[in-house]
Amino acid sequence: MTVQELCAKEGVNLCYFDGSNWHSPGFFNPALNILALDINLSVEDQKQVDLHELGHKEHTPVQYELNRELCELQADRSMIHHLLEEELKLMDDIRDFNYLHFMEKYSLKTIANETMVKDEFNSLIS
């Protein structure tokens, strides 16, 4: 699914910006229901950022202010879940899935990411 299709499915407006001098590749503004993506990102990176930012859709500004780390982890988990779902649909045999290759492909580098990939994989195959 493209970023346009993902946003349409979630009922979120999509816009692009030049993120050359911006601190983030994308953001979700709940007050305006807009997801903004850096136009300079590759299509693959835009999709990854889009999935992460859509993971913030249910977060309120107060939740984010009080528990930013938790909200970021939840958004990462949501992104990982959707990327894994797509990846597994493309595989002939899910027994060939290698979580390290998946993590490398999407530049997932933390122990928290590794745990999420394993958890979401097990959740999706059971």
Regions found by a protein language model. Give the residues of each.
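Active-site hotspot residues in diverse enzymes, especially metal/ion-binding acidic/histidine motifs
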Residues: M1-S126
